[in-house]
Amino acid sequence: MQVLHVCSEMFPLLKTGGLADVIGALPAAQIADGVDARVLLPAFPDIRRGVTDAQVVSRRDTFAGHITLLFGHYNGVGIYLIDAPHLYDRPGSPYHDTNLFAYTDNVLRFALLGWVGAEMASGLDPFWRPDVVHAHDWHAGLAPAYLAARGRPAKSVFTVHNLAYQGMFYAHHMNDIQLPWSFFNIHGLEFNGQISFLKAGLYYADHITAVSPTYAREITEPQFAYGMEGLLQQRHREGRLSGVLNGVDEKIWSPETDLLLASRYTRDTLEDKAKNKRQLQIAMGLKVDDKVPLFAVVSRLTSQKGLDLVLEALPGLLEQGGQLALLGAGDPVLQEGFLAAAAEYPGQVGVQIGYHEAFSHRIMGGADVILVPSRFEPCGLTQLYGLKYGTLPLVRRTGGLADTVSDCSLENLADGVASGFVFEDSNAWSLLRAIRRAFVLWSRPSLWRFVQRQAMAMDFSWQVAAKSYRELYYRLK
């Protein structure tokens, strides 16, 4: 079984979001599972520099100009690169300029990505062609459409990492991207009078996956579907929509081997976690005290992530004796709110604006509770890291959060399945009730330790996801 992942970023070569983490880990897990998985990426500067052994496979003149297809390896995974300097050789973000304006030629930059993905199934590399083209998010959404236009030389899977980003472009660009105008149709890639790369992926793929079972259900509902609910409900009825939970890359996220921690530990040596807490309290300017629960946030500061709820609930958390350590950036109003809280509650609230991968590991290793109060969350990786590190996740019941965290209810504690704290409603009162439950459990150290050990024993490895995808690919054949 030969599978080509078509996408725009891959950790650690280039990362702007969770998609990169998936592509950085899933293909390697699939190779270990017996699938010949390769990755197709635009040759953005950081990616091009990282694939040092790239060799020319093919040269083509396309609707988007001349391209060179390269092939090399990274971390044992075969990587195809679309070398088109006029489209991809730009500093900074792969999607927008330094003023945060989307590049005006994004329609060509990402149509080309989909086109090359489909051409691979028609022999662009004469020595390797995929049985399945697996496209990810709107950037690769045209790959299934180009395959459909070519009579489907390979099966296609389209994975939705976040339905909110739809890849919308003016209709006249149909003249530029070498797809039949008949595809510009409500039964096709047309959406609200424009081309939607996302809808192209959803409509033309043989199968759609979302990054968690709950998110796969949620995106059939109007409040989560951004206008796509009709199509997604139809795909659900046809059995062509399912959820496959993302995994954790255990080579990077494991407290037993994490060199970024002050003290490494396992579920059997959890007492060693205390040194990480002490170091984190010092680093964040918090009072050094192992008796108080340390809550943490590692997140983009947006209302989608529910960080306004944390700000609103913060006085209640602090009144009960807790501390907060926050690492993140985003909405200026939220940034200012958290910085003001740090000034108002010195020793209780520590805030670092920005994102530092290394420091996020130190927070995960040192905190007692990781807050993930998202309004919606397709999968979420932060809570999975929390489970792995015995840093109990406190989450809202939505998307992948609902699939991965079991509340510390009396029933779940008795059944031995409790792994964190879950609240239902997207308001500060509901969040505060969950925080109070965390304090109650904290007052029972042996029970807290029991739940930590439960959480750390859960298996969210990429091997589980790789097996699910392999079964899906074989069903499509």
UniProtKB/Swiss-Prot annotation:
Pathway given in the UniProt record: Glycan biosynthesis; glycogen biosynthesis
UniProt-listed Enzyme Commission number(s): 2.4.1.21
Keyword Glycosyltransferase: yes
Keywords: Glycogen biosynthesis, Glycosyltransferase, Transferase
Record-linked Pfam families: Glyco_transf_5 (PF08323), Glycos_transf_1 (PF00534)
InterPro entries: Glyco_trans_1, GS/SS, Starch_synth_cat_dom
Enzyme class: transferase
Record-level GO cellular component terms: cytosol
Catalytic activity line of the entry: [(1->4)-alpha-D-glucosyl](n) + ADP-alpha-D-glucose = [(1->4)-alpha-D-glucosyl](n+1) + ADP + H(+)
Binding site for ADP-alpha-D-glucose: 15
GO MF annotation terms: alpha-1,4-glucan glucosyltransferase (ADP-glucose donor) activity; alpha-1,4-glucan glucosyltransferase (UDP-glucose donor) activity
Keyword Signal among UniProt keywords: no
BP term (GO), one: glycogen biosynthetic process
Family statement: Belongs to the glycosyltransferase 1 family. Bacterial/plant glycogen synthase subfamily.
Function: Synthesizes alpha-1,4-glucan chains using ADP-glucose.
This protein's name: Glycogen synthase
Species name: Shigella dysenteriae serotype 1 (strain Sd197)
Gene name per UniProt: glgA
